[in-house]
Regions:
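Flavin (primarily FAD) cofactor-binding/catalytic cores of flavoenzymes
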Residues: 1-71, 75-229
Length: 229
């Protein structure tokens, strides 16, 4: 259990056999996978990207859908496009973002991760913190320029130089609203478009969620819940 003593201005950490007092507490319990709200279970054909190498699926002749427009989604897209797990029949890449955005690698972006900036950040009020976190999102959630260029070049070569029939769909600006089983043992992915609010459905034999991770607040931090962002 972790509490904060306002009078002493320090944390009180209670364990099964000892009590510690500290000015700072570092929590290193990791994160858990993040899945869309409409996804309640995983299977061999519908799973989080973190399990890709464990499941090692055969995608030959399959309709494949990737959900998630960040770096892991880009890495998956490029490797599947190149036939790492066999040549798929179709490859869809669905993202909530309006574009496949580049990682913010500007010269001063790394200043956000320096001790001085962190100290000044924690002196802000909650509203300012939320605003700054949203503004800085692409410093961690974007796609490297190298990955985007590799995807562009690979697609250009296959579809514009070699003139292959288009078997890839880039589908930004869409939120996944439902994943349903179909009678032909496939999945139907239902989405809502952010710009025109239209509803669309896409079929896939294999669905991979490159939707990242989320922090799980442990029970022992419950006394500090009102202090956490």
């Amino acid at each position: 259990r972790v509490e904060f003593d306002d009078r002493q201005r320090q944390f009180v950490v209670t364990t099964s056999n000892k009590v510690f007092h500290a000015r700072h507490v570092s929590i290193g319990i990791g994160k858990k996978i993040k899945l869309p709200d409409c996804v309640t279970a995983q299977s061999d054909r519908c799973f989080h990207a973190s399990e890709m190498m464990l499941r090692n699926p055969d995608l030959t002749g399959k309709r494949v859908a990737i959900v998630g427009g960040g770096q892991s989604g880009a890495d998956l897209f490029l490797n599947i496009f190149k036939g790492e797990w066999g040549q798929p029949e179709q490859l869809d890449w669905i993202s909530r973002r309006n574009n496949y955005n580049a990682l913010d690698e500007a010269a001063f972006a790394n200043e956000y991760f320096t001790p001085d900036y962190v100290e000044s950040f924690y002196s802000l009020d909650s509203a300012a913190k939320r605003h700054m976190l949203a503004e800085q999102k692409m410093t961690s959630d974007g796609i490297t320029s190298e990955s985007l260029l590799a995807i562009y070049r690979a697609m250009y070569h296959r579809f514009d130089v070699l003139r292959e029939k288009l078997w890839v769909r880039l589908l930004p600006s869409r939120s996944l609203t439902a994943v349903k089983h179909t009678l032909d043992n496939a999945y139907q992915l239902e989405t809502r478009h952010h710009l025109d609010h239209g509803e669309e459905a896409f079929k896939a034999d294999v669905v991979i969620f490159a939707t990242g991770y989320q922090s799980a607040t442990p029970e022992f931090l419950e006394p500090l819940a009102h202090r956490l962002l």
